[in-house]
Amino acid sequence: MKIKTLTVSDLTNYIKKVIDNDFILNNLSVKGEISNLKFHSSGHIYFSLKDNNSKVNCVMFKSKASLLNVALEDGMEVMVKGRASIYTATGSFQLYCDEIKKEGQGELFIKFEALKEKLSKSGYFDEKYKKNIPMYAKRIGVVTSSTGAVIRDIINVTKRRNPLVDIILYPAKVQGDDAYKEIIAGIEYFNKNKNIDLIIVGRGGGSIEELWNFNEEELAKVIFNSKLPIISAVGHEVDFTISDFVSDVRAATPSQAAEIAVPLLSDINTKIYEISKSLDYEIQKKLKDCKSRLESNERILKLHSPMSKIVNSYLEVDKLKDRLYFAIDIKIKREKQKIESLNNLLSANNPIKVLNKGYAIIEDENNNIIKEISQLNEEKEISVSLSDGNIKGNFIPIK
């Protein structure tokens, strides 16, 4: 009997039919540990269920996921009820889950929590030990795979933000047995290279098993003891590793790590302009203040200099001279006025003027003015003053 040649669709549909008609495979209860958990925007939940030897992909559709009463997380031990089938589009075997019940925590999750608690108590996560990320890094060391998307993302973001920054790659395995040793070697290499400003350690997302190298205690201690600041960019935003907690900064993605490490060149230019403007203002203000103080000191110096004192003394003498001359002039004017007034008074009472009117002044031999007739009661020699001269004679009383 000749067997018909099948198409891929024929094969996957046949296998799906066989599985779908199997009673046991349609009524499964499977126990295992959740790994690579993803919550899709559609509401569906995707994850892997594993034990020490095997792993199977699982999906829980939105209608069933909305009824869950347990918060799923990587490393959780669960019991899943559902059915097995083939997803014909990819030919992948997977479990379609109807119920999920929590059984406990997986071995790796327990190990992760134990190391996290140990390092936390030892101070490995303390903020006081975190190193500052340099504001303007010129050379950035990256420890990651040379073929993955991580290094491409970091280079692309860096070129876009500031093409003047150099990226130096230390190629290392980021998955598989002992990959953490290569990551350690990369960190130690850059710490010996004095031209590096900071280090980015990263890889893409994955299951807890795929990211486990970043949970190794030896790597955590090397990150903690690094002299250079380290940005951890492991997995996606929902993924957390021990390296994230112990590093100086945790980035949700490698692209974000580059954004943290590399400021925009336009922002740098703006900052330089603002600083230059501020410095120019401060310099001008300082010069203005210095000039003002200099002028003030010059004025003070002039006021207190010997020559200034001499000049001021001369000025003071001149003022005093002016005041003295003014006072003398006033005094002279006042005295002149007094003299003129006295002259007028004398002139008004001048005997000559009286004599001009026809009067005469009679004096005895002793020059006493004869005012009354009683002074001439006997014969005397008299002098008579007239307006144009004097005459002398003898006075003889009439009997």
Curated annotation (Swiss-Prot):
GO terms for cellular component: cytoplasm; exodeoxyribonuclease VII complex. It catalyses: Exonucleolytic cleavage in either 5'- to 3'- or 3'- to 5'-direction to yield nucleoside 5'-phosphates. Keywords: Cytoplasm, Exonuclease, Hydrolase, Nuclease. Pfam families: Exonuc_VII_L, tRNA_anti_2. GO terms for molecular function: exodeoxyribonuclease VII activity; nucleic acid binding. Its main location: cytoplasm. Heterooligomer composed of large and small subunits. Bidirectionally degrades single-stranded DNA into large acid-insoluble oligonucleotides, which are then degraded further into small acid-soluble oligonucleotides. This is Exodeoxyribonuclease 7 large subunit. It comes from Clostridium botulinum (strain Alaska E43 / Type E3). The lineage of its organism: Bacteria, Bacillati, Bacillota, Clostridia, Eubacteriales. The gene is xseA.
